[in-house]
Amino acid sequence: KRQKDGLNDAQRYGQALAVMRGGRAGATQARQTLAGLLQGRPDNLWLALALGEAESRAGQAAQANSRFEQLLRQHPNSRPVALTYAEILNEQGTREAGQRAQAMLRPLLSQSGNDPVFQQRYARASELAGDSVRASEAYAEAAFLSGRPEQALLQLQALKRNPALDYIGRARVDARIESITPTVLELRRQGVQDPDLDRR
């Protein structure tokens, strides 16, 4: 239905998502719009997720986290809920937020491991949580899944020098290096180069 601003609900939702990117003031404005929309559609998951994002970006992290925790209880193992909440926790940037995001994403690794966005979020969460080994592995996997196998290989080779890498982790990294290397060699043979790598 159209409101006095001349926009229907779908347009107001889209506008709220756009203004949310405009810093705290935009997020505050988006929060008000989304809260109004959610009142009319209390079971709409996408509105609830967007409202949680807006709350966090408007400086209301505790309220946002409470909303996301409730959504997780209502939708356990939901990738959209987990990925959105992980993004927000990563933006909050604390060690505790990283630990919460890492713990929430870990059970989804087996079914989402081939998703570069998932790997990026898991990598950042692990980094914030102080788990440098898992962070490096996930960043390398994200690079590979984004079409950057040489970058992934270099990251994994660097990870092997990390003193925090234990025997099991080293075996896992060695196996991944072994599986990626043929792809990298074939790309080199074809003359395909990763433009982001410094070849001086």
Question: Locations of the language-model features?
Answer:
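Structural register within alpha-helical repeat arrays
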Residues: 15, 51, 85-89, 122-125, ...
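Canonical positions in the second alpha-helix
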Residues: 36-37, 70-71, 107-108, 142, ...
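Short coil turns that delineate tetratricopeptide repeat
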Residues: 42, 76, 112-113, 130, ...
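Specific register positions within alpha-helical solenoid repeats of the TPR/Sel1-like families, i.e.
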Residues: 18-20, 56, 90-92, 127, ...
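Alpha-helical linker/edge segments of TPR/alpha-solenoid repeat scaffolds
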Residues: 61-62, 93-98, 128-137, 165-169, ...
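Single-residue signature of alpha-solenoid repeat helices
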Residues: 30, 64, 101, 135-136, ...
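Extracytoplasmic and endomembrane cell-envelope/extracellular-matrix remodeling and assembly machinery
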Residues: 1-46, 50-67, 164-165, 175-178, ...
